Amino acid sequence: MKLTTHNTMSYQKPKQLWAKIIPFVARCQSVDYIKQYELGAVGFDLRLFWDKNGNLEFRHGIVSYPADNIWEVLDFIRDHDLYVRVLFELRSYNKKHVKNVETLKTKFKDFCKEIEDKYPTVKFYGGCATCDWEQLYVFKNDEHIPEIGLYSSNTSLFKSPNKILSVIDDLCPWIYAKLMNRKNMKKYKDSEQYISIDFIDIQ
């Protein structure tokens, strides 16, 4: 079993005031990226967007996190020979509220090229938009890692089509991690599979 972390940078304090009031919403990790590595992560998941002022930020859905440490994070990834999935975080439910989608897609593609040129040894993969999984950029080192996503929005706790239960499941990923992380890790313990999880500190 090889662990990667889902929404790696969501341990940070959100930028929006409303998200600071309810920080558990959309948070998928509670320890920083260095600790995630120390707990066994061999891959990270960086979801990118740009705010109204053109500043790069990490995102999970509509929740924004500061990305002023992006180069520090990428240096760490390079120095520890980690995989990193890079995604353009724009969901279908908020895409209609973003007027400059095509401009942002171009920014994402340009940024992917920039980091690939700056970090030629890093094993980047992804390059997609999360709203429809459109392939915006193809990384040269993309090894097409066959990750199994074992977190709430992929594998529901409730096993129900009920939309309210689905929202609870997606907004509170800690619940799934608390109930399922140990079971999932035990199941894949002797496997060579990559599994992507929330709250890697829950083992």
Task: Cite the ranges covered by each PLM segment.
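C-terminal intrinsically disordered extensions
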Residues: 113-145
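Conserved, mostly hydrophobic/aromatic
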Residues: 47
